[in-house]
C-alpha cells in the first residue's frame, strides 16, 4: 500500500468528518495501515473503529473491502458515507439481483471507494470471480472476533475471508474488534494469517468515567425505577425478551419516566422513528434487546442498565460502554436477583440442545422450504422463522440455537436480521414519459416521486410510501398499487420493503443420519460458553473484588488501583463526605481546572485530595451547576476560579 493521495490523514479527517484531531490510537492504526502492515485494532466500544479504515480508504488509490456481519449497521454506515460525498456501497443477501449487478459494475469501473460485504457473500463463486478484476487496496475485517471459535460470536462464514488473502496476497488486512480476550486476539491474527511486521494496538479497557454498580433485588422493577429517578439524563435498559421490552417501557411511562422500546421484530420504519426520538431527546429511556445500540454514537447516555444479565462479559462490556462517551461521569448498572444464577445455567442448556434435536430441526427446515435431499447447494431461501416454529411446534429459543449450531457446523448460513426499506429506480428514458397512459392517482404518484427524490435515474433510491401518499393526496395502499403498476409497465423497478430471514445452503441438503456436529463446534464451544457464563456470574455475584479490576483482569489488563467508584469500592469506603468536605472538594476541583484549562478528568481526580469517587461526584456537581464544561475527557472553567 502507498500513500496514494496528496491529502494527509488530518486533511481527510477535516474534509469529510469535520474533526481536527483523532481519538487515542486512531492515528497510529491509520499510519500502520498506510505503511502496508497487517494491523489489529482492539478499540473498546466508542473508540471510533470506523475512522481507522474510512480515512485510509480515502487516501489509498483503489477499493477498500469491509467485511461486517451486521447488515443494519452496514446500511447505516453506507448512508452516512454517501451523505459525506464518499462513494460507498454494500452487498448483502437482501439486495435484488439488479441492485447487486449495479454495485458490482461500479466496482469494476473503479467508481467505488468502500464496499461493505456480508461474510456469506464470500461464498458466492460469482462474487469471487468479479473480485479478481477489481483494484483492491485494503481488506478490513470488522467485528473480527467472529472469526475465532473461542470468541463469543463465532461465525463460520468469517473463515471465508482467507479467500480474500489468497486473491490479493499483496494487500494488507486491518482487523477490528471492540472486545476480545488475549486468547481470542491471538486467534484472530492466526486465522487471518497475519504476515511478519504486523502491528497490534490495544486501547485500555478502563473507562474511568463509568461507575459499575450491581444492585440485588428480587423485585427488579422497584430498583429500576429508583435508579432511573436517581440518575438524570438519557438511559438504555437492556432486557433479553421482546415482550419484556414493551412491558417495562409501559411500566416506566406509568411511573412518569419517558420511555420507548426497541427490538428486532419491529417494522424498519417504526425502529427508525423510535431510535430518532431517543437520539433527539424526545424520549429519555430506551428499553431494548441487544438489537439496539450498534453503531449508535449518542455521547450523553448517563446510564446503561442491565435488567437481565448478559451471557458474557464481552457482551456486557460492549453494551455498558454505550454510556458516557462524552467523558462525563455515567453509570453501568446491573440489577440481579437470586433467580438469575439458574437463568444463566438454563441459557447454556438452551444454546446447546441435544444433537438429535439439531438433526430434527435441519430436516424440518428442508421440508418447510421444500428443498430435496441432495439439492439446495449455494441457494438462498426466504425463511419465515416464526411460521416454521409454529408449523413444527418448536420452542423458538432452542430452534434458533439449533440454526446457529448448524451454521457453525457449515451446513447452512442462517441470516436473521435483514430488513430492507422500499426502493425505486427509474428505468424508462424520459422521452417515453409523455406517451404513458396512467390513471389519475398513478400519474400523481409518479410526478411526486420525481419531485420528492433525486438520483432516481442513476441508482436505487430509498423511498417512504407514507411520505409519497401525503404529497400525492392518496393512501399508502394506493401508492403501493401505483408503484406496482409502474413497475409492470417497465417504467420503474420497485422493490417493496420487507423484513425477513434467509437460509442459505452452504452444502447440498443431507440426510439427517449423515449430519455431523464436530467437537470443535459443539463440545468445545459449550465448554467455552460455560466459562464465559461463569465469569459473568462471578462478576455479578462476587462482591469482594473491585468491579473494574475484575473486568480488566478478564480482558488481560492489569488494574493499577481499585476504581473507587463501583459499588464494591463505595461499600468499603462506607463513610460519605460531610457537606463541608464535599464543598471543599468542589472548590479544589474548580481551582485545578481554573489553573489548567483543558486538563483531563483523570488529572483532576489524581491531583485533588480525597476519594476518587467523591472527586468524580464533585466534577459531576460542578458540571450540573454550569461551573465547568466537560468536552470529551477534558475539563474547562466556565467562570474564573480565584486563588
Q: Predicted segments — roles?
A:
Residues 3-16, 20-24, 28-50, 57-60, ...:
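Helicase motor core with emphasis on the C-terminal RecA-like subdomain
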Residues 29, 137, 303-305, 494, ...:
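Residue-level detection of beta-strand scaffold positions
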Residues 354-508, 514-618, 625-631, 635-638:
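C-terminal accessory/connector segments of nucleic-acid motor ATPases
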